[in-house]
Regions:
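Metal-cofactor-dependent catalytic cores
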Residues: 1-275
């Protein structure tokens, strides 16, 4: 039941989960949300054996084709249970599962680097990030080491929220670019109640978002974008203009990050309210 201080801002347009970090994920109709985000999101990652860092397409010089791998659970994860195996479709369409005894060898061969599949994040995980030569970014033409939240495979926060209003605004600013949800890897896509085309979620920072009857999120900050948004995946081409447009018009931010105040079920079509 909405309270008097809440305002309707739209509805849940789509839900996305990424079982393995930096691989293509799966679109869902409904999902449980816990204090660690969408159930089963980024539960697995590949660890670079040579550095001990988390493998991430943020450094495409090493991991460019990670985005060409697709990961889906073999069955839906359940609260309180061990995560089920994940089916991985390799770039050449070979299908393997995480429970195979030779999975590390298969993935290492496909990537050209020695990796270990893990469901246990280090206490202080790190990844490498390549910064392209795009004006407005914090760094340019360099690789940095970035800290991740302790004992997780997330970049910054457990939930990423994006509105279709932001996607529509970016399309207006750069009509030649293919701005699609897949490029930005959100968990929750909100379709606004109005037809406004703007970076409307910027104004949600510091406020509370309610999804359906149960889930409440605290919007903590903007989501800074990286080179991953420019990389080819599926039928999407490489396009540095995607990131350049975000940098020129919204400080390289697309979407917002959130923490979970109250978990529960969220479903496609659920009303979204802002407090």
């Amino acid at each position: 039941m909405p309270n008097a201080t809440e305002m309707d801002v739209g509805s849940v347009g789509s839900l996305w989960r990424y079982p393995i970090k930096s691989m293509m994920g799966e679109e869902l109709n409904a999902i449980a949300v816990t204090e660690r985000g969408l159930l089963g999101d980024r539960a697995y990652a590949l660890m670079d054996r040579s550095t001990g860092k988390v493998a991430s397409a943020k450094n495409p010089r090493k991991w460019r084709n990670l985005l060409e791998f697709a990961a889906t659970y073999t069955k839906p994860p359940r609260l309180g249970e061990k995560f089920p195996p994940v089916q991985i479709t390799l770039p050449e369409n070979t299908i393997v599962t995480t429970e195979q005894g030779d999975i590390d060898r298969i993935l290492s061969a496909a990537l050209g680097r020695e990796v270990t599949l893990s469901t246990s994040a280090p206490k202080a995980p790190t990844l490498e990030e390549y910064w392209p030569d795009v004006e407005g970014l914090d760094h340019r033409e360099t690789v940095t080491e970035e800290e991740m939240p302790p004992e997780t495979f997330f970049d910054f926060a457990v939930v990423h929220v994006l509105t279709t209003a932001t996607i529509d605004r970016l399309r207006e600013l750069y009509p030649e670019g293919r701005f699609e949800v897949r490029r930005f890897r959100p968990n929750i896509v909100v379709e606004p109640a109005s037809d406004e085309r703007d970076f409307i979620e910027n104004s949600w920072i510091g406020r509370t978002l309610t999804l359906g009857d149960e889930v409440r999120l605290s919007i903590t900050g903007p989501c800074p974008r990286c080179v991953m948004t420019t990389l080819p995946q599926g039928d999407l081409p490489k396009d540095v203009g995607i990131l350049r447009t975000a940098a020129q018009h919204n400080q390289a931010h697309v979407g917002v990050y959130a923490t979970v105040l109250q978990g529960g079920m969220v479903r496609r079509g659920d009303p979204v309210r802002l407090q």
